[in-house]
Amino acid sequence: MWNRYFVFYLLLLSAFTSQTVSGQRKKGPKSNLLARKSDVQGSICFIDIVFIVDSSESSKIALFDKQKDFVDSLSDKIFQLTPGRSLEYDIKLAALQFSSSVQIDPPFSSWKDLQTFKQKVKSMNLIGQGTFSYYAISNATRLLKREGRKDGVKVVLLMTDGIDHPKNPDVQSISEDARISGISFITIALSTVVNEAKLRLISGDSSSEPTLLLSDPTLVDKIQDRLDILFEKKCERKICECEKGDPGDPGPPGTHGNPGIKGERGPKGNPGNAQKGEAGERGPGGIPGYKGDKGERGECGKPGIKGDKGSPGPYGPKGPRGIQGITGPPGDPGPKGFQGNKGEPGPPGPYGSPGAPGIGQQGIKGERGQEGRPGAPGPIGVGEPGQPGPRGPEGVPGERGLPGEGFPGPKGEKGSEGPTGPQGLQGLSIKGEKGDIGPVGPQGPMGIPGIGSQGEQGIQGPIGPPGPQGPAGQGLPGSKGEVGQMGPTGPRGPVGIGVQGPKGEPGSIGLPGQPGVPGEDGAAGKKGEAGLPGARGPEGPPGKGQPGPKGDEGKKGSKGNQGQRGLPGPEGPKGEPGIMGPFGMPGTSIPGPPGPKGDRGGPGIPGFKGEPGLSIRGPKGVQGPRGPVGAPGLKGDGYPGVPGPRGLPGPPGPMGLRGVGDTGAKGEPGVRGPPGPSGPRGVGTQGPKGDTGQKGLPGPPGPPGYGSQGIKGEQGPQGFPGPKGTMGHGLPGQKGEHGERGDVGKKGDKGEIGEPGSPGKQGLQGPKGDLGLTKEEIIKLITEICGCGPKCKETPLELVFVIDSSESVGPENFQIIKNFVKTMADRVALDLATARIGIINYSHKVEKVANLKQFSSKDDFKLAVDNMQYLGEGTYTATALQAANDMFEDARPGVKKVALVITDGQTDSRDKEKLTEVVKNASDTNVEIFVIGVVKKNDPNFEIFHKEMNLIATDPEHVYQFDDFFTLQDTLKQKLFQKICEDFDSYLVQIFGSSSPQPGFGMSGEELSESTPEPQKEISESLSVTRDQDEDDKAPEPTWADDLPATTSSEATTTPRPLLSTPVDGAEDPRCLEALKPGNCGEYVVRWYYDKQVNSCARFWFSGCNGSGNRFNSEKECQETCIQG
């Protein structure tokens, strides 16, 4: 029988302890199946990782493949991470690539296994356009929030160089929001050319942490270690983190004592009846057993029941304004909102396509006309509001109207500070409520001294008994008395009646008072925040099983031994404050260190009236320094005194700070009241320009106005040409501003030969002149004046710039290219008769900025270059060259055609045009292609890009390679034009009949040996340099042409002549005396003409018709016909 009771007792104990978790009893029983399921979920840590691959144009080919290899290697390492203890990792991976668009493949929803994930990453294809990291971060954040698992660890691995497209939104706010929501970022730089500040802005790392590089051979191990630490930190917190529940019931007493001594087995009883007997009486409770040893710390308990919702906290500070997000689907129309503040002007949008011709935009603001006569009123038009006009003359103040009626409108913005008005009359005195304590005002002026003379000091008399307290006296305050000794505290007198006197000087510091009575206990504080999770305890013993069936009632056990004395119980609640004890004797007056500020005590008991102290008048001390102004006293209980005389007006106070507050809701329009009184003359500023209204119908033309000339307005944007208006009537305007200097005009035709003048008298012999210029000095002078020489200025040329505007170039380098193009244009004579220039700007699309027939002015050409927009996407070089071939179809026959390609990367593989075919077509149409390639030799794609540059260029010598764009402008101009034009060295050789000039007289420091002289270029022209030559009688500039036919040996031989030749007028053929006229047709050929001033022949371009007779087919024919002597 005892054995059955003992078993029942053990089962009851195990059932009781199973309801207890970490010293708290749960409020209700739960299924053990659910408990086991919770344990299984608590031992698994969910991990979601997103790989972001940079698929922009700057990471094509090698870098893009390297990113995919890195994802493949790191994903294997991630699945090799093993957690400690009984924890398990449940990992899912996702990947996305970004450029100007985002492609998510694979997402979390399609996760199967690691091998499938790696295959999808390897199948990624390059997008190859601009870098927009904002959209990559926003899509990754949205993917983790939508498909990531709740309470899991979320990690984003971003690979980029941090150099985004100029139109990329700011990534700071979106990355901060993602980190606040629990997403961790790890950024990896693609190369050493990286914007480290932006990567740290995204990841939130400090500047002391080094930047991770994709080229680092140990990168996979570094990130594996970082992820291992991150997972261990976040997963531990997830498992042991328990929600704070309501306080549990008080715990049970200590464990039961040991069971009593087993009794002897009694004799077997007779079998009873089959009927169940009644339950026996409950036996008396046993004596508590000995208190058991303190058990080990158990594991973290299961989360308790969720606590009650706390009181709402205060509103946090207003956060910074977020950047504009991606446009979502249109939502349902909401209620009418409040009127918001005027927004900041947005960035300029992209240029739209030209619309259909219609009513033109507003033209340039015209000059103000004379005051016109008022015309007849026209019909009411429906049009858009114009710009605010100038301020009109001030009107006469109107009469004061009746006060208006209506609801108060919204508070307007603070106006400008007006002039100080005159002092108003004294208003009715109505005592208001006591205001808040204002700031301490400035010290007032010293008052007028009181009337009276100070008496002599009397002899101190005997101390008399204190008399009764008299009524409050009236009179002027006397002079300040000497500081007496501290007397005992007297009783508090009644409240006085009278005017408050001036504030007295601060007294000496009093003795410390008696300690106050302890204050009452404060109210219970609010529930505290959840504490940090404690360290995981050691493994506990296996849990108890479920209670078994109720056993038979056992026999009453013997009385146990007396237990040991228990530990003292918890401290009881704080008692009520006791009765105040008698005052103790004053202690020593040595002040101790100040203690912590205690709780505010209750009001003390008023003390007894003290006896008057003994006062011995001492000598008058030196007046102490003026003490600080004390705080204003409390409001008195007296009656209001007699109103004093009106004081002098005080100085105006300082202007208060502008209030800060949100704009209130706009009220409903009130009932229109009668017109109010005319206000004072306002001083305001012109308001902001209103929004442009809808375009109105054109109104009828008004009568011609008669106006006076106004001030010249600022130049507005160029509008579309409008219809020709009727002839106006007005006065002539002011003289316009001096325009910019135009291009230098072509040299005029030579005039007709004048009749010979009468011979003059022989002059006196002049003094001997200085030595003439040497040949080297003449060469240097021509080089410095002519630059590339007259050849480039006069040679007919068709030149097309093909400019790379892809993402890898960048906006700064694109600006350098534009400056370079404008500088190159200055080296040629830009007009329709000589050189014509076209421009192609390309990236993933091709923009024809200017064709060959469009510009004949350098200013217009440079303006078109300045207006070119940076595209910042892919590199479609083949399509751009095909556009250049199409542009050369308008070239003049027989004129040299040159295409100059400026790029920094190889063409995109997705380009529809084939580069080899486009280059072959250019070669078949005699188009020379020069290539300027900007790429470093240590670039991984250098070899591929260099082969492509050689493929594009007509000749390997037409390829120029630079490490960066900064050296483009200074080192290329002369060198490139020595290739495009004829070699300047051969030009100087043919003039002076000698070898190359000495070093130092080359093309702006460039060695002329870099250009190979072409033997067919020949000039037969003598250059005369004398001291007495008339300045107006200069030799004409020679003209050249490229691609001239090779001359015969007889033509190539020039007969040496002296540098100084005397002009001869006796030419037999009249053609030699005609002025040079090249004609006006387009079939240009090379001819020779005779120059009488220098008695020599020179080449020129003959248009094919309508020229002068002074032209010959060869130099020999010209010399034999015209040169005499």
From Swiss-Prot:
Q: State the compartments where it is located.
A: Secreted, Extracellular space, Extracellular matrix, Basement membrane
Q: Where is the VWFA domain?
A: 48-227, 798-980
User: Could you state a single Gene Ontology molecular function term?
Assistant: extracellular matrix structural constituent conferring tensile strength
* Alphabetic keyword roster: Basement membrane, Cell adhesion, Collagen, Disulfide bond, Extracellular matrix, Protease inhibitor, Repeat, Secreted, Serine protease inhibitor, Signal
Start and end residues of each BPTI/Kunitz inhibitor domain: 1072-1122
Q: Which SMART domains match?
A: KU (SM00131), VWA (SM00327)
Question: Transmembrane residues, as ranges?
Answer: none
Which positions make up the signal peptide?
Answer: 1-23
Query: Residue ranges under compositional bias (Basic and acidic residues)?
Result: 291-309, 735-753
Q: Which residue stretches does the UniProt record annotate as biased composition, category Low complexity?
A: 437-446, 1045-1056
Disordered, as annotated region:
242-769, 999-1066
Q: What's an example GO BP annotation here?
A: cell adhesion
**Where are stretches of biased composition, namely Pro residues?**
642-654
Asked if the Swiss-Prot or TrEMBL record annotates the protein with the keyword Nucleotidyltransferase, the reply is no
Which residue ranges does the record assign to the Collagen-like domain?
A: 243-274, 301-360, 383-405, 501-544, 545-583, 730-769
Q: What does the function comment of this entry state?
A: May act as a cell-binding protein.
The protein's assembly and partners: Trimer or homomer. Secreted as a 135 kDa monomer under reducing conditions and as a homotrimer under non-reducing conditions.
The name this protein carries in UniProt is Collagen alpha-1(XXVIII) chain
Q: Which organism is it from?
A: Homo sapiens
Lineage, top ranks: Eukaryota, Metazoa, Chordata, Craniata, Vertebrata
